[in-house]
Amino acid sequence: MQTSIPNWLMQRAFLTPERIAVYDGQGKKTFMELHESVMKRARQLANTGVRKGDIVAIFMKNSVAMIECIHALHYIGAIVLLQNTRLTSHELAWQLKDSGAVYVIADDELADRIEGNIRVITMSELSALPEENVEFQQYYHFDDIATIMYTSGTTGKPKGVLQTYENHWWSAIGSALNLGLNENDCWLAAVPFFHISGLSIMMRSVIYGMSMYVMRAFDAKKANELIIGGKVTIMSVVSAMLQKMIADLGERRYPETFRCMLLGGGPAPKPLLEVCKAKGIPVYQTYGMTETASQIATLAPEYSLTKLGSAGKPLFPSQLRIEKDGQVARPYEPGEIVVKGPNVTKGYLHRPDATAKAIRGGWFYTGDIGYIDEDGFLYVLDRRSDLIISGGENVYPAEIEAVLLSHEAVEEAGVTGIDDETWGQVPCAFVKRKRGYSVTVEQLKQFCQAHLAKYKIPKQIYFVDELPRNASQKLLRHQLKQLIPNNENGAL
């Protein structure tokens, strides 16, 4: 028997109609007002031909309108494909084609980035459309796909992660059981809704009946003003965001009304945690991914220094273990992080092989390497082996390598992450040129700019004679840093 639950926003509007759902600096809407706006958007989308079961992409920056569109598509029964607004036209076109999306809803200023034979609906166009009657989904079935987000695998080929209503529901419940709920909570959404860290805030808002404050783009000064003014009580950040906020904060301190700084995007630097401790900032370090519908493990503030570098313990509905050579690893023994729970994806869109490889016996094999100490705290050693986390964005070396290898002058390419004070890590490339060909660092960077989002473009490129490989000719990315000249004077 299929598990169903009342439509989240409809139910929330019925239960707490006058409670504030969303602020955006220009105004606010109650849950009932949001519900009414969503019904109108849904009828306008129906006028364009959107139907139940359609995959509809959203290419927008954070806004109340974006929230309305996501809910409106769910009211119709469509599947929402969230698209990163930092993607190039080439990357975007590939994902739209691979997903089978039939429409794209886009901010007016982003619409010209969309290529290919797909119906584009701009926000100005949508707002002007007449309404058409459509049957709303009164219930959400737990097994149904709610959203799709693309994430690159170690092959560099992006995969669409299928996120069900059940995944989002249990992610919200797990977070509430961990962080608790307060009547006056307001979650600051300064991370993008096209990331799971942002979308999960939107889902929690309607499930909890919690207000959220939407920032179109992160602004450290504005975020601090909201926290100090007592307007928000919880915020999701990555280390680079938190560092900017602390720099702007100066000698000021956050009030006791601010109760949670949820820190993701990789382990936090020790100096940052020590500053947060000194300033009384309640930092909760987390570990999660698109495939787990946000956090699956979290470290409470009281352990932030005694368990420095740990991502904490699994959330209540979830399980986590370390496997090495098919066996559960001993404490402190590194191995693959394996997770299980109702918040874990059912698989990848159109990728049965990748799904079968990742999900075995009900457990999801993350590809991340870590260990668990004797107290059950998780420590992540390597994000997806070679994953680069730059300012909270996942950057996959193989994807960059594939672009470099498509250049006529490049014979071999290897990419790894190097430390960066601002972004945590940035990509660094090592290139072997083809004999008889000439190409400069600047030419390669310009080539990458045409095919990759800005944060994926290598910050340094070195020309080398050979790349390190093992006996089976597999690239040894962890040895690439050894190729950086000792007398470092920039790219060679």
Curated annotation (Swiss-Prot):
PROSITE patterns: AMP_BINDING (PS00455)
InterPro entries associated with the record: AMP-bd_C (IPR025110), AMP-bd_C_sf (IPR045851), AMP-binding_CS (IPR020845), AMP-dep_synth/lig_dom (IPR000873), ANL_N_sf (IPR042099), MenE (IPR010192)
Coiled coil: none
CDD domains: OSB_CoA_lg
Segments crossing the lipid bilayer: none
Listed GO MF terms: ATP binding; o-succinylbenzoate-CoA ligase activity
GO biological process: menaquinone biosynthetic process
Presence of keyword Nuclease: no
Key words of the record: ATP-binding, Ligase, Menaquinone biosynthesis, Nucleotide-binding
NCBIfam families, sorted: menE, PRK03640.1
Record-stated family: Belongs to the ATP-dependent AMP-binding enzyme family. MenE subfamily.
Name this protein carries in UniProt: 2-succinylbenzoate--CoA ligase
Organism (species): Geobacillus sp. (strain WCH70)
